[in-house]
Amino acid sequence: MPKGNRTIIHLVSSAGTGYVYTTTKNKRKSQEKLQLRKYDPRVRKHVLFVEGKP
């Protein structure tokens, strides 16, 4: 079976709470680090999540 072109990444909260989302991204089409604004339940706000080490 061929290996897919998607890799598992972790999105780490920029609020410093240590909260992490796990998702996948296409390693061929998106070379830059992913940044998304998502909900962090530890601070009860939407904050910026940046791609960190898995």
From Swiss-Prot:
Listed PANTHER family: 54S RIBOSOMAL PROTEIN L39, MITOCHONDRIAL, LARGE RIBOSOMAL SUBUNIT PROTEIN BL33M
Protein's UniProt name: Large ribosomal subunit protein bL33B
GO biological process annotation, one example: translation
Entries under InterPro entries matching the protein: Ribosomal_bL33, Ribosomal_bL33_CS, Ribosomal_bL33_sf, Ribosomal_zn-bd
HAMAP family: Ribosomal_bL33
Molecular functions per Gene Ontology: structural constituent of ribosome
Family: Belongs to the bacterial ribosomal protein bL33 family.
Pfam families xref list: Ribosomal_L33
Keyword Cell division on entry: no
UniProtKB keywords: Ribonucleoprotein, Ribosomal protein
Native organism taxonomy: Bacteria, Pseudomonadati, Myxococcota, Myxococcia, Myxococcales
Annotated source species: Myxococcus xanthus (strain DK1622)
GO cellular component: cytosolic large ribosomal subunit
